[in-house]
Curated annotation (Swiss-Prot):
Family: Belongs to the Nibrin family.
InterPro entries: BRCT_dom_sf (IPR036420), FHA_dom (IPR000253), Nibrin-rel (IPR040227), Nibrin_BRCT2 (IPR032429), Nibrin_BRCT2_sf (IPR043014), SMAD_FHA_dom_sf (IPR008984)
Lineage: Eukaryota, Fungi, Dikarya, Ascomycota, Pezizomycotina
Gene giving rise to this polypeptide: NBS1
Keywords associated with the record: Chromosome, DNA damage, DNA repair, Nucleus
Notes concerning its domains: The FHA and BRCT domains specifically recognize and bind phosphorylated proteins.
GO annotation (BP), single: mitotic G2 DNA damage checkpoint signaling
Organism (species): Chaetomium thermophilum (strain DSM 1495 / CBS 144.50 / IMI 039719) (Thermochaetoides thermophila)
GO molecular function, one term: damaged DNA binding
Region annotation Disordered: where it falls in the sequence: 368-431, 444-506, 528-580, 630-654, 692-954
The protein, known as: DNA repair and telomere maintenance protein NBS1
Signal peptide interval: none
Length: 954
């Protein structure tokens, strides 16, 4: 329906009838024209035409009649949704359209107001074709109608309130109406007869003449509760009334009928179909518990309170009605849950509270007979409780009802209220009735109730299990029972009780025992089959002596009660208590011995039996077999595609491209999970900034080596040693290896035993050394060491080894601790080295003069880079060792470089060259340089001695 709104109509809303044209202008030119008093509006400014509804448009919920707006060549023009249409036509396509006439500040709004009626027809009414009458009355009014509840439904037309579509309407904020609502709409749209061009009531004022849906509410039926009409008004709180609840149905038709309403209230509905005479109660109970997230049988863990699982009962009429009644009675007792009826959904929706649908069974387990004797309350609230109790307790014997009925005529003065039961008899002796009346009355009461005579002290377990459920409902009736008590005879008073105990059937004891303790029941059956007593007899306590009894009685003298009966004290005494404890221990010891003896006998019997004597079938019968559901693998398996996951709702396209930070894996993935690599970071102490030399200068490192000295000290030592050598003309060099054998050989050659060894022992590891090789031209044989022969000295870069005959300033056993001590030690070492070099040079010259010497001449040709050398002279006879020296020298060539000169070939002495090579050392000696002049003469330089080192020039 199209509605016209504007402030020009004093806040009224006007209905635009299909098939009619409306004229807007400044003056009234014809009937039905709408006047707008504004100077910028022409006298005939605009027309709005509503097309007729096409045939079948009433059932097309998405269609609507066309609206054509035409500007009649107005002076200022017309704006339709911001578009100027002066002298043009346009068709409205929006739900809300704004029209501005000229420069008038007040605009017109044409709004689409959908009216959709959903009818709840029965199958019989649908066969009568109700759509013809609806088409004639509603289609041309632009009102839509449907047989199903649609999201756009505004009204549900039904004859009852508690229907599936009615529940959906209440949850979604819609109205429930009857057929009278349609008649009221048709009446409001009728045009008065005899008045041409007149408008209907809705065209004049839509809000005032539209019928009120609450006035056309269906009549009240069998639904519980007595609510006012305003309760059925739309309420936004009902949209989530079933949130958190799961309703389980076991009948398909009922499930299909209530599923839309439950889904509309954000609830969840499940179907577990049962087959009459085939479906087991335990199977259904396990399903209900699994839906609730629990296992096994028994009641709900939350006590059927709050949000959770609710079972909807179904009690059809027909052949299977008895089976359905017994079925829901049994599972209700096992679950301790009260199944609801579908009529109760309306009550929960109207109250916006679904907690009333989930209650334990004992909350509504009032006996029907007792509730009838209580003063009637509101009939609407009591009715569902009575019906539930009737259906749940069908298995209870019907003979118990008369026992709870109390005649209303027997009333007298109220007796004092007693909080606990008395075991004694009442003081009231009764009236003087005949004995026949008393005898006749007693059997009638017993036969009517069929309850055996109860002991004076009832069992506490029976009271706690079965009577406690009825205490709240019986509380109002207790004073009445006490008031009429004095009016009854003594025998009648004994037969009537305040609370009737519901006896358990005898055949249920074994089944109840099997459910509670299956192992104990199995042991009991085996003992019965073996011919033994199912329950071993308890040992009889030892009789007490008379004197002890007398003593105990004296300690607790008798006292009289209110009725004059002598009673004893509650406590028995410490001695009896100790004997009871001893009896318990003795009983436990006997049972343990019996169990051990039985086990030993069983083992002995099994050892004597053969393979043929064992009854395997009996053993198999003792096996407990339980069936469990096995989860079936998915049809696609692990090879599912992303499209299938999106279609099934397992994957959201918005997750594409996100990194798998939590390292999820697909279900069933066989890939080996890589272990997380752990990194161990060692921690080192941060050394603070130190000033000065530090500990590293004085201490040794981890390997026991002394750190190297600074370069300045090494340079100073080298320069000092060089000056000593230049002054003496000899190089006191020492050559030594890394082992102990090399040190011993050096001590023998040099003739300083003990000095070098002591110096080597002081150092744990020698520092890097350099070897100085000196060529000697003497004819002495080196096979035997001579104390005057030049040897091989080793000069260390860090600290020279000097053999001195003078005592050292600092003892060798005491290490140096300061720079001054070290400097003094080095000075002593240098003085000793210089003295030793001079003595060795003098001895060497004397030995050369005595044994004979030879001269090696080095010749350097002018303009040439080659150097030639030769040896001349022979030794006179044999030397003092008796060996003949060689008589010639093998010439060799050497090249001179820019900075030094090295000998490439040749040897000083042929006999000892190989020996020296094997020993790892080279020969050395002094050369007499001869320079050839230009005129061919030679100039000898005896004083200048050239010292050579193989590999480099010093």
């Amino acid at each position: 329906m199209w509605i016209l709104e504007s402030e020009l109509f004093d806040g009224k809303r006007l209905w635009l009838r299909p098939g009619k044209t409306y004229l807007f202008g400044r003056t009234v030119a014809e009937a039905g024209q709408l006047t707008i008093s504004d100077k910028t509006v022409s006298r005939k400014h605009l027309t709005i035409h509503i097309d007729n509804v096409p045939e079948g448009g009433g059932r097309n919920l998405r269609s609507r009649s066309n609206v054509i707006v035409e500007d009649l060549e107005s002076k200022k023009g017309t704006l339709v949704n911001g578009v100027q249409i002066r002298g043009q036509k346009t068709t409205l396509t929006e739900d809300v359209n704004e029209i501005k006439l000229g420069l008038c500040p007040k605009t017109l709004k044409i709004r689409w107001h959908p009216i959709v009626l959903s009818f709840s027809f029965t199958s019989k009414e649908l066969r009568a074709d109700p759509w013809t009458n609806l088409r004639d009355s509603l289609e041309q009014l632009d009102i839509k109608y449907s047989a199903e509840y649609e999201p756009t439904t505004t009204h549900v037309v039904s004859k009852k309130r508690n229907t599936s579509k009615g529940l959906q309407a209440l949850i979604n904020g819609r109205y429930i109406v009857t057929d009278s609502f349609i008649n009221a709409i048709v009446q409001a749209t009728e045009i008065p007869e005899g008045e041409e061009g007149a408008s209907s009531a809705l065209e004049q004022d839509f809000e005032a003449n539209w019928p009120n849906p609450l006035d056309h509410l269906p009549p009240r039926g069998e639904e519980p509760g007595n609510h006012t009409t305003e309760t059925y008004a739309p309420d936004a709180r009902r949209q989530e009334v079933f949130d958190g609840y799961t309703f389980i149905f076991y009948e398909k038709k009922q499930y299909d009928n209530l599923f839309p309403a439950i889904s509309a209230g954000k609830g969840k509905a499940l179907l577990k179909e049962v087959v009459p005479n085939r479906t087991r109660v335990d199977e259904f109970v396990r399903y209900v518990k699994s839906v609730a997230g629990e296992k096994g049988l028994g009641s709900f863990e939350d006590g059927s309170e709050g949000k959770g699982v609710v079972v909807v009962r179904y009690t059809p009429k027909g052949e299977d009605s008895a089976w359905y009644a017994e079925f829901f009675t049994k599972f209700a007792q096992q679950l301790d849950h009260r199944p609801i009826d579908q009529k109760e959904f309306l009550e929960a929706i109207l109250a916006c509270d679904a907690s009333m649908l989930r209650r334990p069974l004992e909350a509504m387990s009032q006996p029907v007979s007792v509730s009838a004797s209580v003063e009637p309350q509101s009939s609407e609230k009591v009715r569902p409780a009575v019906e539930d109790r009737k259906e749940v307790e069908q298995s209870a014997p019907k003979q118990l009802q008369p026992s709870a009925e109390v005649p209303a005529t027997e009333e007298s003065a109220p007796a004092p209220h007693r909080r606990e039961r008395r075991t004694g008899r009442s003081r009231f002796k009764g009236f003087d009735f005949d004995d026949d009346d008393i005898i006749i009355e007693t059997p009638q009461a017993q036969s009517s109730t069929q309850v055996p005579a109860l002991p004076q002290v009832p069992s506490a377990s029976q009271d706690s299990l079965f009577v406690s459920q009825r205490e709240p409902s019986l509380a109002p009736s207790e004073p009445m029972l006490e008031e009429e008590a004095p009016c009854n005879t003594r025998t009648t008073r004994q037969t009537h009780r305040k609370r009737v105990l519901s006896p358990l059937p005898e055949h249920d004891n074994s089944a109840l025992l099997d459910e509670i303790a299956p192992i104990t029941a199995a042991v009991k059956r085996r003992r019965i089959e073996a011919g033994q007593d199912p329950v071993p007899p308890l040992p009889e306590p030892e009789p007490e002596r008379e004197d002890e009894d007398v003593e105990m009685v004296e300690e607790s003298p008798p006292r009289k009660g209110k009725k004059g009966a002598a009673t004893t004290a509650k406590g028995k005494g410490k001695k009896i208590k100790q004997e009871d404890e001893e009896n318990v221990l003795e009983l436990a010891r006997r049972r343990r011995e019996e169990a051990e003896a039985a086990a030993a006998a069983e083992r002995q019997r099994l050892a004597q039996l053969g393979d043929d004597d064992i009854d395997y079938a009996a053993i198999r019968r003792l096996h407990i077999i339980e069936e469990i559901e096995v989860r079936q693998p998915e049809p696609h398996g692990p090879n599912r595609t992303r499209e299938q996951d999106i279609a099934d709702g397992r994957w959201d396209p918005r997750w594409n491209g996100r990194k798998n930070f939590k390292r999820f894996r697909r279900q069933g993935e066989t890939g080996v999970r890589m272990p997380v690599q752990s990194v161990i970071v060692p921690l080192e102490e941060v050394r603070t900034k130190e000033y000065g030399i530090g500990d590293d200068y004085w201490l040794e490192d981890e390997e026991g080596r002394v750190p190297r000295r600074p370069k300045e000290t090494q340079t100073q030592e080298r320069s000092t040693i060089g000056s000593v050598r230049d002054g003496s003309g000899f190089a006191a060099a020492a050559a030594s290896g890394k082992g102990k054998e090399k040190d011993k050989e050096n001590e023998k050659e040099v003739g300083r035993p003990g000095s070098s060894a002591a110096a080597a022992k002081q150092r744990s590891k020698p520092a890097p050394r350099r070897t100085v090789l000196t060529l000697d031209s003497s004819d002495e044989d080196e096979d035997e060491p001579s104390p005057h022969a030049p040897g091989i000295d080793t000069i260390s870069d860090s600290e020279p080894e000097v053999v001195s005959s003078f005592p050292s300033v600092i003892p060798a056993s005491e290490p140096s601790r300061s720079r001054a001590a070290k400097a003094a030690e080095r000075a002593n070492a240098l003085r000793s080295s210089a003295h030793s070099s001079q003595s060795q040079t003098q001895q060497h010259r004397e030995s050369q003069l005595s044994t004979g010497s030879s001269k090696i001449q080095l010749t350097l040709a002018p303009g040439s880079s080659s150097l030639s050398f030769s040896r001349s002279g022979t030794a006179a006879g044999r030397n003092e060792n008796g060996k003949r020296p060689f008589g010639s020298f093998v010439s060799g060539e050497s090249t001179a470089s820019g900075r030094g000169m090295s000998v490439e070939s040749g040897s000083v002495r042929g006999e000892s060259a190989s020996k020296r090579q094997k020993q790892g050392s080279s020969g050395g000696g002094s050369f007499l340089a001869t320079r050839r002049k230009d005129d061919g003469s030679e100039e000898e330089s005896e004083d200048d001695e050239l010292k050579f080192r193989f590999g480099r020039r010093r």
